[in-house]
Amino acid sequence: MKILFVEPAIFLSAFAMTLTGPLTTQYVYRRIWEETGNYTFSSDSNISECEKNKSSPIFAFQEEVQKKVSRFNLQMDISGLIPGLVSTFILLSISDHYGRKFPMILSSVGALATSVWLCLLCYFAFPFQLLIASTFIGAFCGNYTTFWGACFAYIVDQCKEHKQKTIRIAIIDFLLGLVTGLTGLSSGYFIRELGFEWSFLIIAVSLAVNLIYILFFLGDPVKECSSQNVTMSCSEGFKNLFYRTYMLFKNASGKRRFLLCLLLFTVITYFFVVIGIAPIFILYELDSPLCWNEVFIGYGSALGSASFLTSFLGIWLFSYCMEDIHMAFIGIFTTMTGMAMTAFASTTLMMFLARVPFLFTIVPFSVLRSMLSKVVRSTEQGTLFACIAFLETLGGVTAVSTFNGIYSATVAWYPGFTFLLSAGLLLLPAISLCVVKCTSWNEGSYELLIQEESSEDASDR
């Protein structure tokens, strides 16, 4: 008997994703550090390889390393842009007919292949530039955005009531927070006690178990398409794919279409800033004046991941006394405050305190997805999440590339500039959400509007 709980797959995937990020960044950082100069990292050092004295030649050297790491991250992100966009859009769109498991399986295969390649790269000390090729190839199978999009669509398929969608998505965020928090907290100890080789191997094993669970134990609430759809040619399949996306907007009334576009803009602009700035935190913490080691970076990652847990608690409590849109406002403005505080953090204590306003960072992601799911029909959920995932893939890669480029250009004169810029950019989703509020957003009214449009379509037939 198949299981209809996607949570175990999310648990394992979140563990692998959270551990892969800081490990890969610090591995590349050390390789570039050692190849750029005659300096080596000490594996048992209790302090970061970092120089705080600006007059020291080591200080200029580490600034050069920061620039090189940032540029390399930029190259990796760009290499996976096009294949990631195509695969994400196609896989999630066809999931409305072929089931949600298909994109989960394919993206899990890609993640597993990439993690195995990381193990080999680290063990045999291959040129780290080969990571660019693995990113390019792995993106064809989909990425974590594809996986999360399929998981969210899987969950929405099982939720009949609108409030249930918000709570269920918030529970997923809680699970993500629990896993990513503990993983982030332990990531530094993984590096220190096990080294990069064994750490990457653990990631590969967890992804293999995840793939086995999805293949053999996870059921799919969405049935396979009819034989007529299966026998469609490839060109007809693509036409049908884009046609469904076009009809998602065309079939909506003017007011609902405007709201749909506005909410998508809000989600993507917020996603652009939050995802784009995320990799910069580690580089910022490695650099002077903080000079954090791998353990402190793990603590910082754990505090950042705690926002999943606190966001779940916030949604659970706030849902009794306020609407989704008000919760989104709270998340945006607290995140903006955290960005501004981080820009001026010059000590370890200040950096930890700057993490506090990020406690509700995940709230807008959950409630905005829930709001979007309420303005489309149940048969359009897969197409909607395909659009979201496609835009998130495009926005995420563009954001990471943009912020890495900005950080590389500004790290020498003011490393915190990127965080100040992020705080300013968060005004865009805040203003967009204000416009949504001015359109008299009401969850019940849009539910009735969708029902009326559906009845009109039925009568036309």
Swiss-Prot record:
GO terms for cellular component: extracellular exosome; lysosomal membrane. GO terms for molecular function: copper ion transmembrane transporter activity; symporter activity; transmembrane transporter activity. It comes from the Eukaryota. Optimum pH is 5. A motif (Tyrosine-based lysosomal-sorting motif) lies at residues 446-449. It catalyses: estrone 3-sulfate(out) + n H(+)(out) = estrone 3-sulfate(in) + n H(+)(in); 25-hydroxyvitamin D3 sulfate(out) + n H(+)(out) = 25-hydroxyvitamin D3 sulfate(in) + n H(+)(in); cholate(out) + n H(+)(out) = cholate(in) + n H(+)(in); glycocholate(out) + n H(+)(out) = glycocholate(in) + n H(+)(in). Residues 1-25 form the signal peptide. Keywords: Glycoprotein, Lysosome, Membrane, Signal, Symport, Transmembrane, Transmembrane helix, Transport. Pfam families: MFS_1 (PF07690). Its main location: membrane. Residues 26-73, 125-133, 192-197, 283-294, 346-347, 404-415 are extracellular. Belongs to the major facilitator superfamily. SLC46A family. This is Lysosomal proton-coupled steroid conjugate and bile acid symporter SLC46A3. It comes from Homo sapiens. The gene is SLC46A3.
